A protein has these predicted regions:
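An acidic, glycine-rich surface segment that forms the CoA-thioester-binding/catalytic face
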Residues: 1-15, 52, 57-60, 64
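Secondary-structure transition/capping motifs at alpha-helix termini
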Residues: 4-6, 34-38, 64, 68
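Active-site cavity-forming subdomains of large catalytic enzyme subunits
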Residues: 9-12, 19, 32-33, 37
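Glycine-rich beta-to-alpha transition loops that act as phosphate-gripper elements at the mouths
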Residues: 13-19, 73-79
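Short glycine/serine/threonine-rich phosphate/pyrophosphate-binding segments
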Residues: 19-27, 54
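Amphipathic alpha-helical segments at domain termini/boundaries
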Residues: 24-28, 74-180
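Gly/Pro- and small hydrophobic-enriched strand-loop and loop-to-helix capping segments
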Residues: 29-54, 91-104
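Short helix- or helix-capping micro-motifs
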Residues: 61, 69-75
């Protein structure tokens, strides 16, 4: 939360493994950039270890990319590459690894302008109706969580409690302020 409270924007640059707490730290930044490096891997694999994301991942990821996509990432624990993370909305840009320094500086200059910041926000909020249908009201969250629970039970037969607990945490806290969740 200290990172979020800084009086200036922050940028997380992801070039390699960004899993678990690393992604949760990146999610606390204002902007995220990933490289197209084949070793770039972004995800929350905690459920594969029998635990749930504990440093804000269950709160920040659904707010950023929407509940259905976040549930898919969190409940499976499977990481994605930089391009897929961009497509999902986890990162704001994906840059070639060999030109990362130049492209990151270019992105920083871009978001200094009001037009650049607005373009990033428009991309993040490009589907407000879909977000409302799946997460921005209590009934939508309940329906989305019930569908996810049904799919999870089919897949795991209830033998893996961590994904079920992660789902429960998200379902109970997503409508609350970030600090309360």
């Amino acid at each position: 939360d200290r990172l979020v409270a800084l009086p200036f924007p922050t940028i997380a640059v992801i070039d390699g493994a960004c899993l678990g707490g690393g992604l949760e730290l990146a999610l606390a930044c204002t902007y995220r950039i990933a490289t197209d490096n084949p070793k770039t891997s972004i995800g929350l694999p905690e459920v594969n270890l029998g635990i749930i994301p504990g440093f804000g991942g269950t709160q920040r990821l659904p707010r950023l990319i929407g509940m259905p996509k976040a549930l898919s990432m969190i409940l499976s624990g499977k990481p994605v590459n930089g391009r897929k993370a961009f497509k999902l909305g986890v990162v704001d840009a994906v840059v070639p690894a060999e030109f990362a320094t130049e492209k990151i500086a270019e992105f920083a200059g871009y978001i200094k302008s009001a037009a650049g910041r607005k373009a990033v926000l428009v991309r993040r909020n490009s589907r407000p109706f879909r977000r409302w249908l799946t997460q921005d009201n209590a009934l939508a969250r309940l329906v989305t969580a019930n569908i996810a629970c049904r799919n999870l039970m089919k897949k795991t037969k209830g033998c893996y409690p961590a994904p079920l607990k992660a789902l429960e945490v998200i379902r109970r806290t997503l409508g609350m302020p970030l600090a309360a969740g």
